[in-house]
Curated annotation (Swiss-Prot):
GO molecular function: ATP binding; metal ion binding; protein-exporting ATPase activity
Main location: membrane
Family: Belongs to the SecA family.
Residue ranges of the region described as Disordered: 886-906
PANTHER family in the cross-refs: CHLOROPLAST PROTEIN-TRANSPORTING ATPASE, SECA INNER MEMBRANE COMPONENT OF SEC PROTEIN SECRETION SYSTEM
Gene Ontology CC terms, in alphabetical order: cell envelope Sec protein transport complex; cytosol; plasma membrane
Purpose: Part of the Sec protein translocase complex. Interacts with the SecYEG preprotein conducting channel. Has a central role in coupling the hydrolysis of ATP to the transfer of proteins into and across the cell membrane, serving both as a receptor for the preprotein-SecB complex and as an ATP-driven molecular motor driving the stepwise translocation of polypeptide chains across the membrane.
InterPro entries, per the entry: Helicase_ATP-bd, P-loop_NTPase, SEC_C_motif, SecA, SecA_CS, SecA_DEAD, SecA_motor_DEAD, SecA_preprotein_X-link_dom
Name of the molecule in the record: Protein translocase subunit SecA
Amino acid sequence: MLGGLARKIFGSANDRRVRGYRPSVEAINKLEPELETLTDEQLRERTVMFRQQLAEGKTLDDLLVPAFATVREAAKRVMGMRHFDVQLIGGMVLHDAGIAEMRTGEGKTLVATLPVYLNALAGKGVHVVTVNDYLARRDAEWMAKVYGFLGLTTGIIVHGLDDDQRRAAYACDVTYATNNELGFDYLRDNMKYERAQMVQRPHYFAIVDEVDSILIDEARTPLIISGPLDDRSDFYNTIDKFIPRLSKGDYEVDEKQRSVAMTEAGMEKMEQMLTEAELLKSGSLYDIENVSIVHHVNQALRAHSLFQRDKDYIVRNDEVVIIDEFTGRMMPGRRYSEGLHQALEAKERVTVQPENQTLASITFQNYFRLYERLGGMTGTAATEAAEFADIYKLDVVEIPTNRKVQRIDDDDEVYRTNREKFDAIVKLIQECAARKQPVLVGTTSIEKSELLAERLKQAGMRQKDFSDRAAFTGSSDGKSFAVLNARYHEQEAFIVAQAGVPGAVTIATNMAGRGTDIQLGGNAEMRISEELADLPAGPEREAAEAKIREEIAALKQEALAAGGLFVLGTERHESRRIDNQLRGRSGRQGDPGHSKFFLSLEDDLMRIFGSDRLEGMLKRLGLQEGEAIIHPWINRALEKAQQKVEARNYDMRKNVLKYDDVLNDQRKVVFEQRLELMNDEDVAETVVDMRHDVITDLVAKYIPVNSYPEQWDVKGLDFAVRDVLTLALPIEDWAKEEGIAGPEVTERIIQKADEWMASKSAQYGPELMRYVEKSILLQTLDHLWREHIAMLDHLRQVIGLRGYGQRDPLQEYKSEAFQLFSAMLGRLREIVTAQLMRVEIVSTPQPTELPPMEAHHIDASTGEDELASAGAALSARPELALATEVPAADRDPNDPSTWGKVGRNEPCPCGSGKKFKHCHGRFA
């Protein structure tokens, strides 16, 4: 109560922050008359002047007022659009590395031009991030007119570009790109072998459009570049056949936690089936040797019980394609990990693709924290303000609308069953269509959108096909409807463009990230491009365009008279933000509008998260068939349920981040070291240090500090030196010398190893030797890093069990991850040293550049592995072929230098009985 009173007197923190920007807005407005008198050339020259002032010591903050005023004047001249005062405030929030919450239709795309221009003056590159290729291309082409007028270059990063095109786009002053492309380019860059092959510049400033969608909804989804493992498609298909034979009592499903577990009876039944199929390696399903089978069974069970076709995924062209739960869009190229996607493919009887090994990965949380400065825009961020502040250190500022919102938001109507709810929805749609009020119906899945479409067809309405140009003409007849979901995404722009005409009925899955406003009366630009595509420029086209604009103006008045856009929600989403995004489609720029949600006790949110108290109250009221209950108390109860879900999801994201930060810190170290190695022309010093460290560690292992020669393991050291360094040295004779000590032995071995490598350098030439050293070092680092990622992934899956032993799983994970990282660096030194001591180059022509990385990495979107083994770069150079095989009779078991080339699956020549790859071959 006191807090509310204080806010009335002093205003909220948000109000005070907005007021703080007003003096700058007034200063920008004062400059407007002066800038209007400048010629186009004089206005353009201000960019050169600003850059000169930056070079002389001024800051970007010093230039904010004149730079913003310059952009506003340029937009007026080039596009006929003038930034409103509230848009100037939005631009300042973005420049201050905050999140500007702006309602739908308030011109976020135009707002971005202000901070983008200002920050691009620094010459370090500004990234504008969108959720899909269509929006990246549209916004870039649209706003490039302003940037180009002011002398800045604009680049676009979309799927399908080669590295040269990407490099050129990133070199521009302003680069528009999708979050996926940016993340994948970063990962690919850190798999390249030369600095010149990388495409991105250092991360300076980014503005993220639909920031809640990217940094909240997709935060837990890592970007992964992976390569296929062995094909096990038959095994997935076999396991899948067992799942339908289980009954409901054989497993328990927890929809809240999205988990499923077999009961005792289920385990016994599964063991019996696996034994009969001769797949079980021992009596019990949970014996250690059956761990892999248990994993496959669990994933198959998840695929059948937790994932629904046309809700979580669709089947298209012999593929299982994931559907984004927040946007309703298909995500081709994205695959569930850990065998779940293969289990879904087996369930749907499509071709089972090979499993993948992770080569590189990063979450959006960690990728966007690479930027020096970050800003974001969205229509709905206030509900997640705490998370933005906590994880990204970004403040959310609600920007006032240019005109007051006139939309009416009704309380929810709750019915007992889905059937009754859909009856009421169809009735309301027909009423709106009859009075020519456009309706947008939001659904949560493809399945629900098609169910409603079928109900409308039964009521006598027909579905529009926007592949027919006639669908664009004039007002809707009130007897047709359009469906916008992942199946019809090719028609998306057309459907949204016509969703605001009088009498239009549009059924859509979640509207997040659609990017296109629903304009009452229709979208003039879309109609002109479609209807006048074949009409050349000239008086006739100008007259036709004017006629279309007049028609749309008349249609807008008709839609306004009918009450504006009516947004009808068919159920509540888990997140209040997604519901607000749907509501926000109505009432843009001060237009009237209406919104209402229809619910039933059978909805997922009500069924899984709704309180028993709510359900009990509704039943006690004794609702009759077709009756609804409407009360603000129900809205509050549902909001509490949504807040619970949001809090749970936030905790999950926070927990994921804590674990991912461990990997992220290690990733930074590896990528920074890798970049330094790539930048170095000569890595000889690094290689020498590694060799000396390896020798020091070897000697310390067999000759303890301050020990006597009789305590030394001379034979062990002799074998280790032959094994790792391929050197046959008189270590036993050295040990017999009077007064000999460990450090002296170390120095002698180092001297011999250095002489051996110096002779190789003299034999093959320093330039070629430097190339070989760099190649082996980078390839070995990449190979070990991939193994390390896999080990951390396995560790993360089981570390939670430590909690049962009263130990903190996170601290245990940090400790063991550090030990694994240290061990990886030790192995790197040892393997690089061993490989370089062994390398023999058959012929020595002049070295050429390393082959391009594109021949060796996986395509981010297709999932096809193009990354060769760790020796790819060497094998691509025939002149670097290693020595040929040596006959077995000529190999000395105690001297690896006599073995020559040994097949990885051959018995090791040392006589251990192991395969070469598991013995000495681990260095090869």
